[in-house]
Amino acid sequence: MLEILKRSLYDAPVFKRGDYNYFIHPITDGVPETRPELIREVVCHIIRIADLDVDKIVTVEAMGIPIGGALSLVTDIPLVIIRKKMYGLPGEIEVSQVTGYSKSKIYLNGIKKGDRVIFVDDVVSTGGTAIAVMKALEAAGAVIRDAVVVIERGAGAERVRSAGYPLKTMVKVDVDEKRVFRVEEVSFRS
């Protein structure tokens, strides 16, 4: 399973950003192009492994959008996108996001108390974004039924789970300064 995803990860170029070996991939960057068969494979796998007894799908701008959008289209579950822009709407929650290479603010709107949600995203590296999003969802009164991230890298997924949040991943990758050298399919980590 996930042969298209695995093959595409092995083909991903890598560059150094500070001390971080950053791989460039259609799921994580939208570059060079995002093929429909790749998104289809990812979304079909999410449907197989996720608890979709939810009111809303939640994702983060930008690279969670292709995954969350496709999942929403297939399941008819509404999509909430956590944005990088503040809108100032009533109930908006500011989220401090820390990734493997940057810090920023993102903004959650469209979640009501009692909403049952699934969080989907492209990659978890440090776990900073996922933990911040889960805390914001809890602050909004949402019930986090599940979380699925396509690519697991580093110790971030374990950090998320250790913080008490659900998280399933699809593949785990290891990257050095030249290439993605290991892609391992994950069987039902939650």
UniProtKB/Swiss-Prot annotation:
* Zinc is among the record's keywords: no
Where, subcellularly, is it found?
Answer: Cytoplasm
Name the predominant localization: cytoplasm
Keywords (A to Z) from UniProt: Cytoplasm, Glycosyltransferase, Purine salvage, Transferase
Q: In which pathway does it act?
A: Purine metabolism; IMP biosynthesis via salvage pathway; IMP from hypoxanthine: step 1/1
* Segments forming a coiled coil: none
Record's superkingdom? Archaea
Pfam families linked to this entry: Pribosyltran
Please give an example of a GO cellular component term from this record. cytoplasm
Any one Gene Ontology BP term: IMP salvage
Look up the EC number in the record and give it: 2.4.2.8
Q: Signal sequence: where?
A: none
The record's comment on protein family reads: Belongs to the purine/pyrimidine phosphoribosyltransferase family. Archaeal HPRT subfamily.
Function statement: Catalyzes a salvage reaction resulting in the formation of IMP that is energically less costly than de novo synthesis.
Subunit structure, interactors included: Homodimer.
Name recorded for this polypeptide: Hypoxanthine/guanine phosphoribosyltransferase
**What organism, scientifically named, is this protein from?**
Methanothrix thermoacetophila (strain DSM 6194 / JCM 14653 / NBRC 101360 / PT) (Methanosaeta thermophila)
